[in-house]
Amino acid sequence: MQDKLIVRGAREHNLKDITVELPRDRFVVITGVSGSGKSTLAFDTIYAEGQRRYVESLSAYARQFLGLMEKPDVDSITGLSPAISIDQKTTSHNPRSTVGTVTEIHDYLRLLYARVGTPYCPICGRKIEKQSPSEVTDRLLAGFPDKRAILLAPAVRGRKGEYKKLFADLRREGYARVRVDGTLYELEEAEKLKLEKFEKHDVDIVIDRLTLRESDRSRIAESVELGIRRGEGLLRVLLPDAGEDGGAHEELYSEKFACPEHGSVLEELEPRSFSFNSPYGACGDCAGIGAKQEFSPERIIDEKLSIAGGAIIPWTKKGADAGIYYWDKLKALAEHLDFDLKTPWKDLPAKAQKAVLHGPGEAFEVVYRRGGKETMRFMTEFEGVITNLERRYADTESEFMRERLEELMELRPCPTCGGTRYKPEILAVRVGGLNISQTSGMSVLDADAFFQQLQEGELDHAAIEPFLKRHTGGTAKAHGPLHYEYDLGTFGAAVAAPILRAIRTRLKFLVDVGLDYLSLDRTANTLSGGEAQRIRLATQVGSGLTGVLYVLDEPSIGLHPKDNGRLIGTLKNLRDLGNSLLVVEHDEDTMLEADYLIDMGPGAGVHGGEVIASGTPEQVKQDKNSLTGKYLRGEMKIEVPAERRPGNGKFLKVFGARQNNLQDVDVSIPLGTMTVVTGPSGSGKSTLIHDILHATLARELNGAKTTPGLYDRIEGMEQLDKVIEIDQSPIGRTPRSNPATYTGVFTEIRDLFTRTPEARRRGYQAGRFSFNVKGGRCEHCKGDGVMKIEMNFLPDIYVPCEVCHGARYNRETLEVKYNHKTIADVLDLTVEDAHEFFEAIPTIERKMQLLLDVGLGYMKIGQPSTTLSGGEAQRIKLATELSKRATGRTIYILDEPTTGLHFEDVRKLMDVLQRLAEGGNTLVIIEHNLDVMKSADYLIDLGPEGGVRGGTVVAVGTPEEVAAHPTSYTGEYLRKVPGIVAAEPRARGEKAEKPAKAKAPAKKRTKKQTELVEAD
């Protein structure tokens, strides 16, 4: 078998006809500066070809569903295995997808509860026992005397099919009627029905039609017994006139599960009963999502204003006449409940607030007056603002109105199920004393301990008590058991053994990749890219496949240095199973642990696309041409700043933060500094900074419609004028967006073209040089430059427009030139070339210089934003912020800005961040990178662990002070950083005070805070 994967003549994107040999069944890391071609080689060439060859082997019919990848621009690839990509861009956005469902642990939980779960009555908590036919007969006669009844035996429940054969068989057996999907039919009629084959149906056999009289007990008992036998333990009884208002009512009886006191019946327990994606288990109110979009009083009411002053926001907006229409009713309501419409909302009594929002629930008198005279007097009702908005939202057919109303809504836990997603009768089924929602709500680590104790028969009440008070339901609450059962019994233990083994194996893999803090019910759309990737990595390790090529994109993202060892161990386990690993990575530990290292470069974009060095980590480390090698051997490094900024003496203070796992923490951020928030994965960093601090600042300073997490108060906001979050999200969602449009430089370039003699002679305005509007763009391709051709079972192809040949503009527009270049030529310039070309235009030259400063000189200014990496998008945003005049009152929030960045890129990034801080601005950065930590003025370390074991402030202070902290994991790793000398930690009570001006043992600070230096 070939022992090498050989790529010959790769020219995809910026690759320069490279040939590279990779050892098979080894752990290979590809590194290099951002934009050097790492992902192009790993994903767009090697993975794309592996996937394409596999899909091409399938039938043409199958290919049109899978989507064939385009053949990469490469001469040949040999030694290629089937490829699986584990990147960060395929996180599920489905609210039904959770950690448990993605890892398949939830599937095993459903099986466990269906096979060994103990059902209890959701009303009284009594253990549900079987019902015999005689007990069912007694219940019917006692509960519905002299009522007409139709006894039905369930034959089909929620299954697909046409059931013609079933109907024919039933007629031969002597039955006369059936009920199909809730409608009664003669069997002759039923046989003529054309049921949808691929839709789910319910079919019940009519056993008997009778009146429930004591004199007919023997007939009733006989029919009940037959019905239960024919329905395999279940019997439905339809009572046509026993319901409310004389309507129909239906009873369900089970030979197996029913509470003798309340009659609570549980259908036969099956795995689908415990799925929140199935109508058999899901809460009927929220359909198993666990949350509902509801109108938020916080978004509807401005508490600082009075009703007369416009407190009811949707009724005071321009164009909303509801305020005028309801004004007389509101005045009458105020008289009725004795409150003043001119009183600020926050000072109104709770009863008045409730009446305005939800209606008073009673009629009251309204007097209409016009010109001071009474014109009408009558009794009326007031539905309430929220009820009014709900009605309008349900009735409107206008997409615009729907979107406007959705701005006033937010996702809130379902009031019926309390966010558990399940019906109360499903929550009443327990294993080891806990229901399925309670076990899903545990962290991975707690769940592993619980199932181990269950497996070993060592469970007791003390072990499950911390989990009993939550996940019991909302208004449809499930009563706790009267008597708990902790063990499974001999039979149950034998049935559960293989299920528990499978659950614990998968939990162990999640622990190994550093995700022990996640709960199994955590929705997938709330996971970071790194977390989602490591979950899929754990799933792949659990699959036990061999001979596969795994291509991974920075699996260490979001991991604290303390968790890196476990991740690397998992990657090696995957390799040891007999797989090849190709990992795009910038983490130093991962590089040094690899079997083989490839360094791409030397620069980015047109300056990259070459293999600079390859070999073992030690060989690359000693390579004189390798930039990565210079950093690995310490010849180049990011220097520790000579001193820490003390800040401007003012603070932004958060008190009582307690969202998610935060444990009532107080933190102080010194303004005018670069503050880095650190801590293990899941310790509460994003909750504190994003969910509480950023959400509050965005609402108060920027007027955003955000809903912050739980906290007591935030002080110091008056010192700031705006908050800006600089993340790695795309700068635009369409190919029409590009660096030139985002930075605003395209507007200036178009204005420049309008001032050329030719444009003036023709009367062209700035719009003529836009490819987004009619006039100057090529109308054949609508300014896209390419035409999409659908190929059905072949991949769609994009070909240059045959009219403009990819230029995007029509011939007349391209006849206008500035310094011998058309507008299309200018958009095709790199930032470096554009900087030189527009040297005489200060406004454009300055913005190009800033893009150069952040390391984007290789990028074309007209490059579609959809092709930019997250790191590139973030640096464009940073350059745009640097181009603005510094006020010293802006706070910037960044979440792991070093994602996708090489050591050299981090150095450039730190230069830019230090420049922002030098302008007196405040930076708050969530980061695990030690180079960023050591460059900070102030650190806030959360922990000590993730999940329920985190959420507290472990240490605060300068990097030197945190390094001296005895229990901080961050401090432990900072102590190993050259140039950081541990200083005495400050007293805990001083955490909110002004950080000391700490000296670090480094050379005198130069103009740039972080610089590239040659080691002595």
Curated annotation (Swiss-Prot):
Belongs to the ABC transporter superfamily. UvrA family. Residues 985-996 have a biased composition (Basic and acidic residues). ATP binds at residues 32-39, 679-686. Residues 984-1016 are annotated as: Disordered. This is UvrABC system protein A. Its main location: cytoplasm. The UvrABC repair system catalyzes the recognition and processing of DNA lesions. UvrA is an ATPase and a DNA-binding protein. A damage recognition complex composed of 2 UvrA and 2 UvrB subunits scans DNA for abnormalities. When the presence of a lesion has been verified by UvrB, the UvrA molecules dissociate. SMART domains: AAA. It is found in: Cytoplasm. One of its GO terms (biological process) is SOS response. A zinc finger (C4-type) spans 259-286, 778-804. GO terms for molecular function: ATP binding; ATP hydrolysis activity; DNA binding; excinuclease ABC activity; zinc ion binding. Keywords: ATP-binding, Cytoplasm, DNA damage, DNA excision, DNA repair, DNA-binding, Excision nuclease, Metal-binding, Nucleotide-binding, Repeat, SOS response, Zinc, Zinc-finger. It comes from the Bacteria. InterPro entries: AAA+_ATPase (IPR003593), ABC_transporter-like_ATP-bd (IPR003439), ABC_transporter-like_CS (IPR017871), P-loop_NTPase (IPR027417), UvrA (IPR004602), UvrA_DNA-bd (IPR041552), UvrA_inter (IPR041102). Forms a heterotetramer with UvrB during the search for lesions. The lineage of its organism: Bacteria, Thermotogati, Deinococcota, Deinococci, Deinococcales. Residues 315-627, 647-975 form the ABC transporter domain. GO terms for cellular component: cytoplasm; excinuclease repair complex. HAMAP family: UvrA. SUPFAM superfamilies: P-loop containing nucleoside triphosphate hydrolases (SSF52540). It comes from Deinococcus radiodurans (strain ATCC 13939 / DSM 20539 / JCM 16871 / CCUG 27074 / LMG 4051 / NBRC 15346 / NCIMB 9279 / VKM B-1422 / R1).
